[in-house]
Amino acid sequence: MFLRQEDFAAVVRATPLISLDFIVENGQGEILLGQRLNRPAQGYWFVPGGRVCKDETLEAAFARLTQAELGVRLPLAAGTFYGVWQHFYDDNFSGEDFSTHYIVLGFRLRVAESDLRLPDAQHGSYRWLTPEQLLASDNVHENSRAYFSPDAPAVGL
């Protein structure tokens, strides 16, 4: 269920969101990053992903989000669970008047580049970087760099 903007703003202001992030690796061991068009993390390079909607199963969210973010609908079984992560932002989708808090379920995926049909709704452009390159780049958001940093492990379960 997608909410009206004012209802979604009330949710973001008051609660954490649940989202899925996709750590997509190609055959050369490079990671897919998109340059975000929207807040939060606008302008930064970030792994693809998105939020889980109310009453949406993880299986349905995974399929919907891989279609929306990668241009190919994949089943949950295509991903390898990579842990629970916490993302905090000082801004939100509509501005700077309140923060955004995500609880993120990370999933690693190996996908052939030729299978992807990368959309332009959330990211203005895309690139592939090695883990070493993305760790060294200040233009890659810290929350995406954390997936490869030994100093920022997933939340223990």
Swiss-Prot record:
Mg(2+) binds at G49, E69, Q122. GO terms for molecular function: GDP-mannose mannosyl hydrolase activity; magnesium ion binding; manganese ion binding. A motif (Nudix box) lies at residues 50-71. Binds 1 Mg(2+) ion per subunit. It comes from the Bacteria. Keywords: Hydrolase, Magnesium, Metal-binding. CDD domains: NUDIX_GDPMH_NudD. Its cofactor is Mg(2+). The keyword Magnesium applies. It catalyses: GDP-alpha-D-mannose + H2O = D-mannose + GDP + H(+). Gene3D superfamilies: Nucleoside Triphosphate Pyrophosphohydrolase. Residues 3-153 form the Nudix hydrolase domain. InterPro entries: GDPMH (IPR033715), GDPMH_Gmm (IPR028613), NUDIX_hydrolase-like_dom_sf (IPR015797), NUDIX_hydrolase_CS (IPR020084), NUDIX_hydrolase_dom (IPR000086). Pfam families: NUDIX (PF00293). Coiled coil: none annotated. Substrate binds at F2, L3, F8, R36. Its EC number is 3.6.1.-. HAMAP family: GDPMH_gmm (MF_00941). Homodimer. Belongs to the Nudix hydrolase family. Hydrolyzes GDP-mannose. This is GDP-mannose mannosyl hydrolase. It comes from Salmonella typhimurium (strain LT2 / SGSC1412 / ATCC 700720). The gene is gmm.
